[in-house]
Swiss-Prot record:
GO BP terms: adenylate cyclase-activating G protein-coupled receptor signaling pathway; cell surface receptor signaling pathway; regulation of signal transduction
InterPro entries: Cys_knot_C, Cystine-knot_cytokine, Glyco_hormone, Glyco_Hormone_Alpha
Family, similarity comment: Belongs to the glycoprotein hormones subunit alpha family.
Disulfide bridge map: C30-C88, C47-C102, C56-C118, C60-C120
A GO cellular component annotation in the UniProt record: extracellular region
Gene Ontology MF, one: thyrotropin-releasing hormone receptor binding
Protein name: Glycoprotein hormone alpha-2
Major subcellular location class: secreted
Native organism: Mus musculus
Protein encoded by which gene: Gpha2
Top-level taxon: Eukaryota
């Protein structure tokens, strides 16, 4: 194959692989991601404020494979697939102060948690 068609083919393959992905999804792993949060003091919104907090977003490694013979025997041949996975989770938190604007031009404050660091860790149904 001549050189020019090979280069064109590689460029087209590169476009096909990366099209439709945002920069964040193109980077493997688990990363901090900012999002806007609105805090209200009560259901009526007597005091409220907003803050950019951090979440953990991304993907981590997982795998599934046929179980070993010893696992099959021990499970009565019911556990024929063994899987292992990790989930993107918050590894540490920090408190941040949110300033609230209240009715009557009063001001208040409230502390909320935001992610400080993220990591791939054992998947859990619920941590809280």
């Amino acid at each position: 194959m001549p050189m020019a068609p090979r280069v064109l083919l590689l460029c087209l393959l590169g476009l096909a692989v990366t099209e439709g992905h945002s920069p964040e999804t193109a980077i493997p792993g688990c990363h901090l991601h900012p999002f806007n949060v609105t805090v209200r003091s009560d259901r009526l919104g007597t005091c409220q404020g907003s803050h950019v907090a951090q979440a953990c977003v991304g993907h981590c490694e997982s795998s599934a494979f046929p179980s070993r013979y010893s696992v099959l025997v021990a499970s009565g041949y019911r556990h024929n697939i063994t899987s292992s996975s990790q989930c993107c989770t918050i590894s540490s938190l920090r408190k941040v102060r949110v300033w609230l604007q209240c009715v009557g031009n009063q001001r208040g404050e409230l502390e909320i948690f935001t992610a400080r660091a993220c990591q791939c860790d054992m998947c859990r149904f619920s941590r809280y």
